[in-house]
């Protein structure tokens, strides 16, 4: 069975504003919620409304849907069909609770293991360090399990007790009278903060949190060829996990300082090489600096300013190991600002000989004179 158009589901046109989408969703969600509606197929209709709102209320998902239809909306966002929770971790009971207050709906077990938070660290490298890679020892602030209480939060020699108010479930039932009748919501127990356990005697080191703030030294290997703005993931070096869950990850964001001579374009290195008029006109062999050392470059006679030469394999290594970039040398003629009398005489003599040459410049001069 094919899906209905999301705009049609909410009774809207494609140009509907965000506010119109939200109002339509609230109205239809109340109408079809299974706890209230007695209509046939209310659950399916509610899910359909919820699915449409999940896509159209998000600018990125809506743009994908407008361009590609249901195929675009379901690509890269984990899908929306069925009766499970969305990627944000809430079900339709949780959404409905926003209309009536409380915190009803299905909740995650507060004592289940959870991964720790990810951390981000910024580093600045010199141009050459980014080309060849480097090992760094960084010191970052992290929250680690308290050594005194082993992360329990309870004073050594004591243990946590089951919360008497929620019987260890971490949730309590709250009844509310609404225009639709009496609604029973499940919400986090305020006495144990939803953990289902109480700490009678708190650890004096961490004050019951089970964590302490530390500065941790971590060795980070910067791969050769990394570029400005790229990041490195160091697995398991983020914040400590909760309830025995795995630690988060550390993301090292790299910034590369600019170089006075070199520029970078992907894996290639670009530089400009100043040459004299004589070197360009007569040809020469010059030394060009590269990050790998100086190399000799032959300049053919008659080379024009702006000509680009390629030095194969003298660029940056690809950060993923796919070969090596090149270096491109752009030559520029340098016009001297101070000349001796002898140099001026030589140039005047050269200019006089050029006028006799039927070159492009000669043709241009005649054109301006109307010849």
Curated annotation (Swiss-Prot):
PROSITE patterns, A to Z: DNAJ_1 (PS00636), DNAJ_2 (PS50076), ZF_CR (PS51188)
Binding-site residues for Zn(2+) 1, renumbered to this chain: 146, 149, 203, 206
Binding locations of Zn(2+) 2: 163, 166, 189, 192
CXXCXGXG motif repeat residue numbers: 146-153, 163-170, 189-196, 203-210
Cofactor-binding details, from the entry: Binds 2 Zn(2+) ions per monomer.
Domain J: 5-69
Zinc finger (CR-type): 133-215
InterPro entries: DnaJ, DnaJ_C, DnaJ_domain, DnaJ_domain_CS, HSP40/DnaJ_pept-bd, HSP_DnaJ_Cys-rich_dom, HSP_DnaJ_Cys-rich_dom_sf, J_dom_sf
A GO CC term assigned to this protein in UniProt: cytoplasm
Described purpose of this protein according to its UniProt entry: Participates actively in the response to hyperosmotic and heat shock by preventing the aggregation of stress-denatured proteins and by disaggregating proteins, also in an autonomous, DnaK-independent fashion. Unfolded proteins bind initially to DnaJ; upon interaction with the DnaJ-bound protein, DnaK hydrolyzes its bound ATP, resulting in the formation of a stable complex. GrpE releases ADP from DnaK; ATP binding to DnaK triggers the release of the substrate protein, thus completing the reaction cycle.
Homology family: Belongs to the DnaJ family.
UniProt protein name: Chaperone protein DnaJ
